[in-house]
Each structure stands twice: as structure tokens, then as C-alpha cells.
Regions:
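Active-site-adjacent structural elements that line small-molecule/cofactor binding pockets in enzymes
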Residues: 1-290
């Protein structure tokens, strides 16, 4: 039986009654492999900053892995992000999955006085951020001269005690090729990358990996999917919904596209019930089909 990983999105909403730690603990108790959170800072809706919230989650859980899904690279200096990641991973007992992306929300960057990068710069900046992290994590003194980011005899200690996986959320041809060159994982979203687009996108990644001298099997493909387990669910674009068996069949079908992990975002307000139904009625059926 193939080992499939299942993750659960933890909302960054900071509205009254929100309890991301309780949500993560429930996911851990129900056997999820990882929890994740997105990275949006700007706006009138109350929300937590991602690193801070996930650090609090890591401190209050013991087994479950913790993923950034995905950090907007322009928000933070890549070398500082690399050090933050090393510290987070060490303090959490080796549980970090570092997800990164080029940064889609130009209005957020402008609002915070950051440059809204061109599509080319977003891809290049993302790839440079990965190379900087890997260099700082492995070399005693690391100098890097990129188009957008640089380090000069930079040193961080201690080095990570193990390989920290880096997943990239990418869609365009150049970004997919960069994923193949440098990433450990690819995490597209169902609504932006529907199933019919996946084969060509994945081929682009695997081809770039081969061209870079990498083993394509080293790259974990993770599908980010909005789900609702509900016998009365009305079909919605971008949402996998229906009775447990129907949801499980749909998710299991994505295995044929090369996905080895899934990150679930819950649709609807009944979060605890949905989390439990996924864990007890959907995930076992998908595992059995793998």
C-alpha cells in the first residue's frame, strides 16, 4: 500500500472564538500528517501572522508536521527566512515543511511599501530564496549573487539537523521549471490547477528535474483541495463535495495524476465536524485505494 500524506489547513483568521491551536491539536489527535496555513498579512479582516501562529501551534503539539502554504517570498528577506526556518524546525523537533511562492498579492506588497514584482522577478526571486536557504543551511560561509537577492560570507549556526523539505506553489511554465530544478515538493491548488491541467504541469516539473540531473521521484506532489463532506452538498466550482464515499472516490482519483499528498481546506462553518468526518470517513477510504 502506498503511503499517502494528509494535511489540514488551519485558518489564520483572528476573529472572536478562533482557536488555531485547538484546530491543530484536533488534527493531530485524528491522525493528520501535517497542518498548514497561508501567508496573507494585509486587509481589514482580522488575521494572525503566519510564522507567529504556526510557532504557537508547534509549541502546543508534539507529532504533527507544520507547513507554510505558502510564504510570499517578497515579504521577507530570504536569508532571514532561512534562519527563521532553521530555528522553527529545531525548536519543533524537526517538523517544519517550508512552503514558498513568488507572491501573488501585489496589492498587499504595495500596501506595505514593498515593490510589486513582475512575473519574471517573482519566479526568479522564489528560486533565489530556495538556493539561499539551501546554501546557508549547508555551507559554513555562503556568498550568493542573484539578480534580486544576495548574501556575502553569510553564516548561520547551528545548521539544520536534517533536510528541511521545501514545497513550492507554482503554476506558470517558468515557475514549474524552477520547481523541478530546486524544490522537494509541488503544491498547486485545485481551483487554480484543475485536474485536466495537472499532467502537462507535472510533466514540465519532472522534465526540468531531469534536465537538472535530479531524480523526478524526489519531488512530492501535493494537491491543495477545498472539501466538504455533506450528503446535502450542492456542487460548487473549485470544491470537492458530497457524501463521504463520493469525496473519497474523487480524492482517490487524483492519485492517478501523481499526487502523493493532499492538503484539505474546509468549506463551511462546522470545522470540527468536517475535520472528524474527513479523518474517519474519507481518509481511510483513500488510503485503502492507494
Amino acid at each position: 500500500m502506498t503511503t499517502i500524506q494528509f494535511g489540514l489547513n488551519v485558518s489564520t483568521a483572528a476573529t472572536p472564538g478562533a482557536d488555531p491551536v485547538a484546530d491543530a491539536r484536533m488534527a493531530e489527535e485524528l491522525g493528520f500528517d501535517f497542518v498548514s496555513a497561508n501567508d496573507h498579512l494585509h486587509g481589514t479582516d482580522p488575521r494572525f501572522e503566519t510564522w507567529t501562529m504556526l510557532s504557537w501551534i508547534a509549541a502546543n503539539t508534539s507529532r504533527i508536521r507544520v507547513a507554510t502554504r505558502v510564504l510570499g517570498v517578497p515579504y521577507r528577506n530570504p536569508a532571514v527566512t532561512a534562519k527563521m526556518a532553521e530555528s522553527f524546525d529545531r525548536l519543533s523537533g524537526g517538523r517544519l515543511i517550508l512552503g514558498m511562492g513568488g507572491g501573488a498579492s501585489d496589492d498587499e506588497f504595495r500596501a506595505f511599501g514593498l515593490e510589486a514584482r513582475s512575473p519574471r522577478d517573482k519566479v526568479d526571486g522564489m528560486e533565489e530564496a530556495v538556493r539561499i536557504a539551501r546554501g546557508l543551511w549547508s555551507e559554513r560561509s555562503f556568498t550568493f549573487g542573484g539578480r534580486l537577492s544576495r548574501t556575502e560570507s553569510a553564516q548561520i549556526e547551528p545548521k539544520p539537523s536534517h533536510h528541511i523539505p521545501i514545497w513550492l506553489g507554482t503554476y506558470g511554465d517558468r515557475a514549474l521549471a524552477a520547481t523541478g530544478r530546486v524544490a522537494d515538493g509541488w503544491i498547486p491548488s485545485f481551483d487554480y490547477a484543475p485536474p485536466e491541467r495537472i499532467p502537462a504541469m507535472r510533466d514540465r516539473i519532472l522534465g526540468a528535474a531531469r534536465d537538472a540531473g535530479r531524480e523526478p521521484d524526489e519531488i512530492t506532489c501535493v494537491y491543495n483541495v477545498v472539501v466538504r463532506v455533506d450528503e446535502r452538498a450542492v456542487p460548487e466550482p473549485g470544491v470537492v463535495s458530497g457524501p463521504p464515499a463520493a469525496v473519497a472516490d474523487r480524492i482517490a482519483g487524483f492519485l492517478q495524476l501523481g499526487f502523493a499528498a493532499f492538503n484539505f481546506i474546509l468549506a463551511g462553518p462546522d470545522r470540527d465536524e468536517q475535520t472528524a468526518r474527513l479523518a474517519r470517513e474519507v481518509i481511510p477510504a483513500v488510503r485503502a485505494a492507494a
